[in-house]
Structures are given as structure tokens and as C-alpha cells.
Amino acid sequence: MKKHKFRETLKSFFEPHFDHEKGEMLKGTKTEIDEKVNKILGMVESGDVNEDESNRQVVADLVKEFYSEYQSLYRQYDDLTGEIRKKVNGKGESSSSSSSDSDSDHSSKRKVKRNGNGKVEKDVELVTGALKQQIEAANLEIADLKGKLTTTVEEKEAVDSELELALMKLKESEEISSKLKLETEKLEDEKSIALSDNRELHQKLEVAGKTETDLNQKLEDIKKERDELQTERDNGIKRFQEAEKVAEDWKTTSDQLKDETSNLKQQLEASEQRVSELTSGMNSAEEENKSLSLKVSEISDVIQQGQTTIQELISELGEMKEKYKEKESEHSSLVELHKTHERESSSQVKELEAHIESSEKLVADFTQSLNNAEEEKKLLSQKIAELSNEIQEAQNTMQELMSESGQLKESHSVKERELFSLRDIHEIHQRDSSTRASELEAQLESSKQQVSDLSASLKAAEEENKAISSKNVETMNKLEQTQNTIQELMAELGKLKDSHREKESELSSLVEVHETHQRDSSIHVKELEEQVESSKKLVAELNQTLNNAEEEKKVLSQKIAELSNEIKEAQNTIQELVSESGQLKESHSVKDRDLFSLRDIHETHQRESSTRVSELEAQLESSEQRISDLTVDLKDAEEENKAISSKNLEIMDKLEQAQNTIKELMDELGELKDRHKEKESELSSLVKSADQQVADMKQSLDNAEEEKKMLSQRILDISNEIQEAQKTIQEHMSESEQLKESHGVKERELTGLRDIHETHQRESSTRLSELETQLKLLEQRVVDLSASLNAAEEEKKSLSSMILEITDELKQAQSKVQELVTELAESKDTLTQKENELSSFVEVHEAHKRDSSSQVKELEARVESAEEQVKELNQNLNSSEEEKKILSQQISEMSIKIKRAESTIQELSSESERLKGSHAEKDNELFSLRDIHETHQRELSTQLRGLEAQLESSEHRVLELSESLKAAEEESRTMSTKISETSDELERTQIMVQELTADSSKLKEQLAEKESKLFLLTEKDSKSQVQIKELEATVATLELELESVRARIIDLETEIASKTTVVEQLEAQNREMVARISELEKTMEERGTELSALTQKLEDNDKQSSSSIETLTAEIDGLRAELDSMSVQKEEVEKQMVCKSEEASVKIKRLDDEVNGLRQQVASLDSQRAELEIQLEKKSEEISEYLSQITNLKEEIINKVKVHESILEEINGLSEKIKGRELELETLGKQRSELDEELRTKKEENVQMHDKINVASSEIMALTELINNLKNELDSLQVQKSETEAELEREKQEKSELSNQITDVQKALVEQEAAYNTLEEEHKQINELFKETEATLNKVTVDYKEAQRLLEERGKEVTSRDSTIGVHEETMESLRNELEMKGDEIETLMEKISNIEVKLRLSNQKLRVTEQVLTEKEEAFRKEEAKHLEEQALLEKNLTMTHETYRGMIKEIADKVNITVDGFQSMSEKLTEKQGRYEKTVMEASKILWTATNWVIERNHEKEKMNKEIEKKDEEIKKLGGKVREDEKEKEMMKETLMGLGEEKREAIRQLCVWIDHHRSRCEYLEEVLSKTVVARGQRRVSQRT
């Protein structure tokens, strides 16, 4: 029975491990995988996968590797399943036979005992089969993992494609950045040019200030030089005298010639030295003269610039004044003043033209004088040339006289040439002089014979010397005259400086006047703008007249006359409107006052213009005086030139006479020539200065012409403004007509209201309620829309800030993408290398292509699934993009709605104002109607009360009469007729009562109707309140939506921040985990040392162990539990194979070795082994705890990786949102461009209209075109200034943007460096992990070797123990009877032990398989590590290169930015100063204008209120008149009715009187009858008595 139980347990343990159906399924899957692998290889080799050969080779190599691993696993699986099936079938047959004979006899037990070991081995084999099945399942899981790896590879490829797209985008962004850089460079060049221009201007100004002082100093130097020249002239005269004395000495004694020759040599040397000194001095003087001329030219340029600036300022002042005149003339209807102003301007223009013509004539005279001066210069040069020829002739004569001294002639000719080049031929002259002296000494004897000849020649020479001296005197006089002219010119320069200073003071005063005028003009402009705003109300009425005026403008040629006529017509129409509209009398009176003030302003402005014209005329006169002075100076210079020419002739005559002193005279001639050149240079400089002044005058004339053109254009502008004023007048006329029409309509409505008072009450009440509700709704809508607009603006601001932040994040992402691109490039290089390596392995794997078809199919299916996933992802992306587009469209629609809302707000505001006016009118009407109704009610109530009193009195009378009638009927029937008449009268009175009751019922109905109207009004108010509440609810919902959008934006920002913090936390946690792993590894090493110590203790204790079998059974049960826990741990270890499987395998091997030793030493184990096993259990528990910790760490790492991936996905989503926002921005930019185009078209239309007007007015304003052109040029200059200021502001903005970009780039660089550091740290951590894994592998190998050594030792011990067991078998037979009872227990224990051994073997096999897999993975990891190292090196190189380039770019940008910042700072300081001045003036003017505008607005409001009140009062008066009329009618009706009632009463009274008289007569008759009867009765009684 126990054996059956044991077999059943084995079957229950092993049956699930081998299933026939699962085996067939695995075969089918194997065939499918083989087909798929073959298909993939075929596609790869045919080139269907990709066009790149590298990708094909990689895919083929991966498939082959996968297929080889798969085949190896499948072979192991086939072997294990085959062995298990054989063993299971054998056991099934043996189980049936053994079950019948299990309990038959005791002998079978012995067989079982003998065959126990064989059965245990079979059981062990079964257990190994089960373990093999588990290994196969693990292999299947490995295959699944590999499939996941393929999917990850495909995902990586998809990521690579996305990275390529990102690279393309990065390239585009780089191109854009390069374009921006080029633009920035261009802007910087322009900035540098502008800065250089400004610096040059500053330098010129400084030079202008310095040159004034330099000129003064140079004037003093010139005076000193003049004194020196005078002294030299005296010295020259003295030398002439000495030369004459020497000539007389020559006549007397020829013996003294030798001494004289020596003296002459000395004098020649001294003269040569003097000549050299003079030449150097002359050169220095020439250089100084040149510098002076340059400085004078610079001063003249500066003066010209100052004059131009003065003219510009004057023109600007004139422009401003004319602008203010235009503004005043636009809104003034003073045509006569305009005509006078035009006449004055035309006369002034004519005068200016005359001045210009005279100045042009003067310029022509100047040009002629300059031409004459140039001709005279040419004559002087010719005379100088003739003088040089005469000198040469004199030299020739000297050579003829000095026939014996031919060498002297050569020396003279050489010296003549040396005058032009003194420095170059000085040495040659010295040599010639020495040779000449020797020759003179040799020829003194021959000269004695020729003394007589020479005496005659000397006499002639003396005469010539006298003539030359006279000429020298004349030249000196002329030199003095030139010096005097120079002094005069210097004085003129001083005067010019003084005049310049005066002009500067005038300029400052003009600037102050200009500022004051600007203030006044700004105030006046604001007043005119207010008037224009007030006149805009009449624009609608004047449109028709404007169209007519435009048609007339096209036809008519003379614009000014037409304008004046139209203005007169407009004034007449205005006067007619004023006469027609009595309500607007006050506004027109105010306008008349304004017109009078404008007249005064216009007269003052005319006075200012006349003063300005007089100032310009004075300036022209001063310029003419300057021109006349310059002409005088030119004439003086010409006379000086003539005098110099005569002096030169005289000097040449003296040179012919002074033959002995020719050397000194030649030196002096050289000096004179140099002086002549200096004078010529001075004259040329004077001529240049004159030319410059003439040019300045021409420029001033040109400026005057430009001013004329500007004035003409300004006149055109004035005409245009007059046209606009006419348009406004026409519009006012049209508005007045509309007001009249509206007034007539209102009068008609009032008449209709009088006729239909009751219906109007109903309609007015309903209308008023509706208007009140509408007003409330509109006001609430305005408030809500304003709030929504503010919220939208705040949202726009927040969105703009978000966009900026997202752009920063985009830049960071782009930098990261660039890094990834570099990594991809490096990985591609490594892949190409690997492909070359793998190409060698292709031939080996060709045999496996057939078997890999099924694998190819599986891979195809996976590829298809991956493609489907990719499609799904693409669809998701497309959907997200569509959602982004939809969001962008919604945003654009929201912006359009906001614009529409703004427009609707404006419309509603205008409508609300109109409705308020109408509401006020209707309120007034309502109040008047209510008053009328109340008075009417009061009157009706009084009438009803009177009628009721009358009814009561009539009823009383009817009762009395009925009683009297009854008495009368009883008394007499004759009164029936009268009674019928009275009944008719009563019926009439009853009819009247019924009518009165009907009237009272009608009045009651009217009251009921009014009460119903009031009820309806209350209902409408309630409805309007409900609508207001609904609108408030919608506004609240919109605000909630806005708040939700803001909250989303804030959430996104918080999510981004939290994700960044999470990433940082994950990095910190990774570091902590790495530290913990390192600590755990250290603890594992310590545990390994403890285990080695324990193994040594086990060996010692094995020798001494002799424990009982019972303890072994308990220990085996514990080992079984441990094995179960170890199987669980192994499953966990299989999941965690990557990190710590090697350590577990080492420990499990040690445990296997220990268990084998225990199995072999079952009989000899004792209590010590139990203690050791308890220690092992503790250690295994510790190992399991460590493994669980490792798994937890891995799970945490995986979760963090997932979180990181999710963060990356969110970042991608944000980037896509940013793209959508960019698209929205592009759409907004397009809309803006469209709006700009519309504005341009409108501007073009306006320009076309202005062109038409200009064409119409060009025929009349031909004279003023010059002035207008000048004004246009000044306007263009002002526009250029404004444009430059705008460009400066733009450049400032660009500068700020560039600084922001630089900060962004720096942030991106910092982030890149941080990312690089994190990558380096991760790489270091990976390297440390690899090192640790290598160390653990080394430890595992060492432990494995030690385990093999221990196994060998244990095997020896086992053999020794077997021998001892053989010895003790005999003793065992004797004890067999005692052990029969315990045999079954031992068998069960042995079976358990065998099961444990089987499990251990299976676990060992699993561990070996896992070790193989790990070795393969280690190789793959090593390859990947090498790849990563190479990629890291390339990345480091690329990063260094990028860092260097970025740093260089940053330095360049920083330098350029600093330069631009300096320039901008200087410019900004100047601009701020100027802006401060202008802002002060503008602020003061704005304050004045503000007060004026407020006053005018208040006045206008008061006028409007007064007009409205007057209108309301008129309407009320009219209504009251109508009511009075109605009341009079009603009173007449009542009077008529009362008269009728009075007549009826009179008739009734008359009838009653008649009736009473009748009754009285009847009573009297009856009384008489009674008295008669009584008398008759008394008589009868008396008679009877008698």
C-alpha cells in the first residue's frame, strides 16, 4: 500500500510536466517558427525589408542567432521529453505487477530492499525528466523574452525614425538660427555704422571746438612768422647793400678778389645752410598751412553743418507753425483771412523768389570772379615761367661774361636746378662750389685783364640791381598788404565766430520758442480735435454735399476759389441749420466764440509768420553782405596777386644786376618763390573757402527752394484739410437733417400718441420694460465681456509665458535630440563594423535557413503586430495632431469670438447709449403720461363722485315722486299723461346713469389694463432678471472654463516641475540603489567567507558524525521544505537572471555538493550535522531575503524606467502641443499679415484720393511747390528720425530678445552638461556593475573549482566508506530481523531522499543551463559594453567639440552684444535726455490739453444735457398742450353734457312747477269746493234746524 501511495505521489508530481497535447502543440509551433524564420531570411536576402544593406545584415544575423539558440533549447527539450516518456511507460508497466504482490509475503520486501537502489535511481531519472520539462518551460519563457527583445528593437527603430525626424527639424531650426544670426550680424553692422556716424559727428563737434582755439594760436604764430619774414627782408636788403659795396670794391681793387672769393665761399656755405634751414622752415610752414587749410575747411564744414542744422530747425519751426496754421485754418471758416494769408504768402514767395534770383545772380558773379581769379592765376604762373626763363637768360649772360669760369656757369645752372630740389642736390652743390673756388683762384690773373670789361658790366648790373631793389620794395609792400588782408580775414573769422555764437544763441532761443509753440500748438490741436469730434456728429448729413463737392473738384481747375465758395456755402448752410434748430443755438454761439478765438490765433500766427519772414529776409541780407565782403576780399587778393607779379619782375631785374651776389640772391629768390607758393596756397585756401561759402549759399538757396516746395505741399495739405473740414461740415449738415427728420418723426409719433393714448400707454409700458431689461442685459453683458476680455488677456499673457517656457523646453529637447543624433551616428558606425564582422558568420548559418522558416513566420507575425502597434501609435499621433489642430482652431475661433465680442461690445455700447437716450425720452414721456393719467383719474373720480351724488339725489326724488304719483293716481287719473312724461324723463335719466356707469366701467377697465401692464412689466422685469441670471450663469461657466484652462496650464507646469523633481528623485534613488547593491554584494562576499568556514566545519564534523536515522528523517523533511522554497526562489531567480543569478548558482552548487555528501553519508550523520543544516537554513533564508531585496530593487528600477519613459512621452506630447501652438501663432501671424494688407489697401485708397485732390489743386498751387517740397523733405527727415528711433527701439527689443536667446542657450548648455554628467555617471555605474559581475564570475569559477576538489575528496571517502559497509554487511544480516520492522520506514525515507536528490539534480541541470545562458549573455553584454565604450568616446569627442563651438559662439555673441550694448547705452542716454526734454514739454502740453479737453467735454456734456432738457421740456410742453387741448375738449364735452343736464333739470323743474301749480289750483279748487260744500251743508243744517 505504501508503494502504491508513493507511485501515486510520483505520478501526481510528474504527470503535469509531460503532456502529449502540449508536445504536439510545441511541434506545430516549431514548424511555424521555422517557416517564419525562413521567410524573414528570404525577405532580408531579397532586399524587401529595407534598402540599406546594413539593416538587412543586422536583421539576418539577429534571426540566425535567435534560431541557433532556439534549436539548442528545442533539442534539449526533445531529449528530456523522450527520456521522461520512456521512464514513465516503464514504471506504468511495473506498477501494475507490483501492486498485486505488494502485500503477499515477506520475501517480496526483501526483493524490494535489494532492488531499492535501482528504484531510487529510476525515481531520480523521473525527477530529472520533470526538471528538464521545467527547463523547457524556462526556455519557452526565454523565447518570449527574446520576442519582447525584437519588439523593443522595432520600437527602437521607430524611435530612431522619430529621432531622424527630430534631426531634420533640428537642421531646420539650425538653418533658421543661422538666418537669424546673419540678420543679427547685419543689424550689428548697421548699428556699428550708426555708432561710427554718431562718433564722427561727436568728433567733428569736438574738432570744431578745438579748431577755434587752434586757429587763434595759429593766427598768433602767423603774426610771429610775419615778423620773422620782415626781419629776414631787412636782412636781405642789408645783404643787397653789402653786395653793392662788394661790387664797388671789385671795381677799385682786383687784388682783393681772392679774399672775396674766400668770403664768397664762406657766404655760399652759410647761404646754403640758410637755404637748407629756410627750405625746412618753408616745408614746415607749408605743412602748417596745409593743416590750417584743412582745419579751416573743417571749420567751414562745421559752420555749414551748423547753418544746415539752423536751417533745419528754422524749417522745422516754420513747419510746426504752418501745421498749427493749417490746423487753425482747417476748422475755421474765415475764408477772407485765408485769402489774405494766401496773398501774403504769395507775395512772400515772390519776394523769396526775387531774393533767390538775386542770390543766383550773385553766385553767377562769384563764379565769374572765380574764373577771372583762376585766369589771373594762370597769367601769374605764366609770368613766373617767364621770370624763370629770364633768370636762365641772366645766367647765360653771366656765363658769357665769366667765359673763363665755365665750371661756375655749370654750378649756377646746377644751383638753379637745386632751387626745385635743394635737399637732393646739396652735396653736388658743395662739390661744384669747391671746384669753382679752385678754378677762380687759378683764373684771377686772367680776370685782371677783363676788369675794364667787367666794370662796364658791373655798371649795368648796378642799374639792374637798383631796379630789382625797387621791385623788392614793391613786393614787400604787396606782402604787407597781403598780411593786412590776412589779418582782415582773421578778423572776419572772429566776426564769423561771433556771428556763429549769436546764431547759436538765436538757435537756442528759437528752440525755446519752438517748444513753447509746440505746447501752444498741441493745446490748440487738442482743442481742434475736440471740435472735430463735436463736428463728427454732423458727418452723416454732409456726405451728400461731400460727394457733390468731390465731383465738382474733379471738374474745376481753380481749387482755392472752389474751396472758398464751398466754405461760404457750408457757412450759409450752417447758419441756416442754426436758424432752423433753435435748440442748438447755444452750441453755435460757443462755436462762434471759438471761431473768434481762432481768428485771434490766426492773426497772431500771421504776425509770427511775418516776423519769421522778416527774420529770413534779414538772414538773406546778412548772407548777401557776406557775399559782398567775400567779393571785396577776392578783389584784394587779385590786386595782391598783381602786386606780387610786379614785385617778382622787379626782383628778377635786380637779380640780373647782382651777378657777384648771385648766390645770396638766388637763395633769396628761392625764399621769395616759396613765399609766393605759400601766398598762392593761401590764396587757393581763400578761394576754396570762398567756394565753400558759395556752396553754402547754394545749399541755403536749395534749402530755401526745398522750403518753398514744402510750403507748396503744405498748402496742398491745407487744401486737403479744408476739404476734410467741408466733409465734416457736410456730415454735420446730414446729421442735422437727420435730426430734423427724427424730430419730425417724433412730432408725428407724438400726434399719434395723442390720438392713440391708450394703445401708446400699453406699447410704451411694454417697450420700456423691454428696454430696461435689454439695458440691464447689455450692461451685464458688457461687464461680463469686459471681465472675459481681461481674463482672456491674462490668459494670453500666461499662454505667451507658457509658450516661452515651452520654447525653452523645446530648445533643451532639441539639444538632447542632437546628442541622440550624434549617438545614433556613432551607433551606426559601430553597426557597420558589426555588420562586417557578422558577414563572416553568414556562411555558417546558411544550413539553418530551412529550419528557421517557422521562426521567420513568428517574427513576421510579431513584425505585423508591431506594425499594427506602430499604425495604432501613428493613428494616436494623428488623432492627437488633429486634436491639436482642433484646439488651435478653437483658440482661433475663440480669438475671433473675442474680437466679435469686442465689436459687439462696442456696438452694444453705442446701442446702449442710444437706448439710454431713447429710454430717457420714453421715461419722460411715461412720467408725463402718468401725470396726465393721474390727473385724468382724479377728474374722473371727482366726476364719478358728483354723478353718484346726483344719482342718489335723483333716486330720492324718484322715490318721493313715486309716492306722490301713487297718491296722485288715487286722487286723479287725469295725471296719467303727466306721469307718462315723467316716466320718459326718468328713463332718460336712467340712460344717462347707464352711460355714466359705462364710462366708469371703461375707466375701471383702463385701470385694470394699466394694472395688467404693470403686472406685465413686473413679469418682464422678472424675465429680464432670469435672462440676466442665465447670462451670469453662462459668464460663470465661461469663467469656470477659463479657470479650468488656467488650472490645466498650471497643472501642466506643476506636472512638468513634479516630473523634473521625480526624475531627479529617480536619479537619486538609482544612486541609492546602486549603493545598496554594492553593500549587498559586500555582505554576500562576507556570507561566502562564512560559508567556506562552514564547509570546513562540515568536513571536520563529517569525520566525527554518527547520528541516528530519525534525525536524518527530520533533516530530510526540512531539506524538502528548503527545496520547495528553493524552487520558488529559482523561479524568482529566473526572472532576475540579469543581476545576481551567478551568486545563486554558486550557492546552489555548494548546497548540491553538501546534499550529495549527505546522501552518501546518510548512515554516519549525527546531531552536529543537524546544527550545521540549521545554520545552512538560516543562510539560505538570508540569501532568499537578499534575492527578494534584489528583485524589489529591480522592480523599483523598472518602475522608475517606466516613469521616465512616461515623462519622455509627456514631454513629447508637450512638444507636439508646442508645435500646435506654433501653428496657432503662424495662423495669428497670417491673420495679422492679412490685416496689415487690408490696412495697406486702405492706405493706398487714401493715397489715391489724396493724389486726386493733389491733381485738382496742382494747377492753382504751382507757385508754392518749392516750399512744399522743402517741407516734404523735412517731413521725410522727421520720418527718418522716427524710423531710426523705431529701429533703435526694435534693436533694443532685438537686443533683449538676443539676451533672452543667449540666456536660453546658456540654460540649454547647462542642461546639456547636466545630461552629459548624468550619462557619465550612469556609464560609470554600468562599468562598476560590469566589473562587479566579472568579479562575481571569477568568484564563481574559484568556488566551482573548490567544489570539484571537495567532490573528489568526498568520492575517496565514499569508496572507503563502501569498503567499511561491505565489512559491516555481515553484521547487518545478523541484525536484519531487528531492522525488518523499521525497513518500511527506511524505504520511505530513502524514497524521500531519492526524490530530494532528483530535485537537486534537476536544479543542478537548470543551473547549468542558466550558466550557459548567462555566459552567452555575458558575451553579448561584453560586446554591447565595447560598443557603448566606443559610442561614449565618440560622444565625448562630439560633446567637447560642441562645447568648444558653443563657447566660441557665446564669446563672439557676448562681445558683439557688449559692443552693441555700449553703443545702445550711449545712444539711449542721448535719446533719454532728448526724450526727457520732449516728455516734459509733452507732459505740460498734455496736462493743459487734458484740462482743456475735460473742460470742453464737460461743456459739451452740459450743452447736450441742456439740449436734451430743452427738447424734453419742449416735448413736455407739447404733450401738456395736447393734454390741455384734450382736457379742454373734455371740459367742453362735460360743459355740453352739463348744459344738457341743466336744461333737462330746468324743464323738469318747470314741469314740476307746472304740476305744482296745477296741484295748487286743484287744491284751491277743491278747497273752494269743500268750503262751498261745507257752507251748503251748514246752511242745510241751519235750514234743517230752522
From Swiss-Prot:
Q: Where is the composition biased (Polar residues)?
A: 444-455
Q: Which PROSITE patterns match?
A: NAB
User: Which stretches of sequence are listed as region Disordered?
Assistant: 88-119, 249-286, 325-353, 430-456, 965-985
Q: Which InterPro entries match?
A: NAB (IPR011684)
This protein's UniProt keywords? Abscisic acid signaling pathway, Cell membrane, Coiled coil, Cytoplasm, Cytoskeleton, Leucine-rich repeat, Membrane, Repeat
UniProt feature, compositional bias: Basic and acidic residues: 249-262
Q: Where are the LRR repeats?
A: 173-187, 188-210, 216-239, 261-285, 287-309, 384-410, 437-461, 473-498, 560-586, 613-637, 649-674, 768-792, 824-850, 856-880, 902-929, 944-968, 990-1014, 1077-1101, 1120-1144, 1195-1220, 1247-1272, 1372-1396, 1398-1417, 1426-1448, 1450-1474
One Gene Ontology molecular-function label: actin binding
According to the UniProt record, one GO cellular component term is: cytosol
What is known about the tissue distribution of this protein?
A: Mainly expressed in photosynthetic and vascular tissues. Accumulates in both dark-grown and light-grown seedlings roots and shoots, leaves and flowers (at protein level).
Q: Where in the cell is it found?
A: Cell membrane; Cytoplasm, Cytoskeleton
Question: Where are the annotated coiled coils located?
Answer: 128-411, 437-1196, 1225-1336, 1372-1406, 1496-1530
Task: Output the superkingdom of the source species.
Answer: Eukaryota
- General function of this protein: Positive regulator of abscisic acid (ABA)-mediated signaling pathways involved in abiotic stress responses (e.g. osmotic stress) and leading to various plant adaptation (e.g. stomata closure).
- Return the protein name: COP1-interactive protein 1
Q: Which organism is it from?
A: Arabidopsis thaliana
Q: Which lineage is the organism of this entry classified under, starting from the top rank? A: Eukaryota, Viridiplantae, Streptophyta, Embryophyta, Tracheophyta
